[in-house]
């Protein structure tokens, strides 16, 4: 079979921090994908290499087999209504924090939906990405989504009931790491092993506090801390700069940081992030 016959068309709506990373990671190697992107801020779509800009959101949805929704939670409902008539028979993947597959299905109908939560370390292909599937998605759909996000780092399939907790741990967790390093006396270019293990212990405890089993908590904590440190070392940015990058206004990480900067407790910060994710989901 020729490549032309096997290339999958993937449309990405939203070309911000995460949408652009997903697009570039899927396009830089020969993964047999044709990547289309759309963003309401047209200036973001200039000088694209190996990625095609769609003229509008309807064109992207109509021409894609897989649609990745890389938009903020508050923008999702409008986007879903815009693409509804184009998604029959297609796979929809959402990275919007807090919004369930049930919520998306309520607007789109009986559509195959996968929910995904990557983190900022996707920039260096070391993301810790959690995934779950909706009512109409198949195991094969989940495998395909896992394959796509494997190019961004490690993946973990979890129950949807734990996705908001994953948002608080692996999604917002890098900010806790950056804040810890930012307020430490050691050189951020030479992070001591005892500090690394201290951060892992704190994040693992926070994960268990939110209901993860011991093995999953350890997996998420170790990978999130290691990936965050790796991002810091590879980008050579200050911890404060990376913390600000991962802290979106009104998001789960901002809620966590408001608590962490006051009492320094990772468990309390993670609870605040979870509470914010649940608040975003209350429309369900």
Please give the residue ranges for each predicted region.
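NAD(P)-dependent Rossmann-like dehydrogenase/reductase catalytic/cofactor-binding core
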Residues: 2-7, 204-208, 212-284
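Glycine/serine-rich anion-binding loops at beta->alpha junctions
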Residues: 118-122, 167-177
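Hydrophobic, well-ordered beta-alpha structural blocks that scaffold small-molecule cofactor pockets
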Residues: 2-9, 20-29, 37
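Glycine-rich Rossmann-fold phosphate-binding loop(s) that bind the pyrophosphate
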Residues: 15-16
């Amino acid at each position: 079979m020729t490549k032309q016959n096997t290339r999958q068309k993937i449309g990405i709506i939203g070309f911000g921090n995460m949408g652009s990373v997903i697009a570039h990671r899927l396009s830089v190697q020969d993964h047999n994908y044709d990547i289309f992107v759309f963003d309401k801020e047209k200036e973001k779509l200039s000088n694209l290499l190996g990625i095609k800009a769609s003229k509008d959101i309807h064109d992207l949805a109509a021409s894609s087999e897989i649609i990745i929704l890389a938009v903020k939670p508050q923008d999702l409902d409008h986007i879903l209504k815009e693409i509804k008539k184009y998604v029959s028979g297609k796979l929809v993947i959402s990275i919007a924090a807090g919004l369930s597959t049930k919520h998306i299905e309520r607007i789109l109908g009986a559509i195959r939906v996968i929910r995904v939560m990557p983190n900022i370390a996707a920039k260096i292909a070391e993301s810790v990405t959690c995934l779950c599937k909706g009512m109409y998605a198949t195991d094969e759909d989940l495998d395909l989504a896992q394959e796509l996000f494997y190019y961004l780092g490690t993946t973990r399939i979890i129950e949807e009931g734990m996705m908001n907790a994953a948002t608080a741990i692996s999604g917002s967790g890098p900010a806790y790491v950056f804040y810890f390093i930012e307020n430490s006396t050691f050189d951020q270019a030479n992070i001591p092993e005892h500090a690394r293990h201290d951060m892992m212990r704190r994040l693992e405890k926070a994960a268990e506090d939110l209901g993860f089993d011991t093995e999953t908590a350890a997996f998420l904590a170790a990978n999130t801390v290691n990936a965050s440190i790796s991002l810091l070392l590879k980008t050579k940015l200050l911890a404060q700069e990376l913390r600000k990058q991962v802290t979106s206004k009104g998001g789960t990480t901002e809620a966590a940081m408001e608590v962490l900067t006051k009492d320094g407790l990772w468990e309390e910060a993670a609870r605040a992030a979870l509470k914010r994710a649940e608040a975003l989901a209350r429309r369900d």
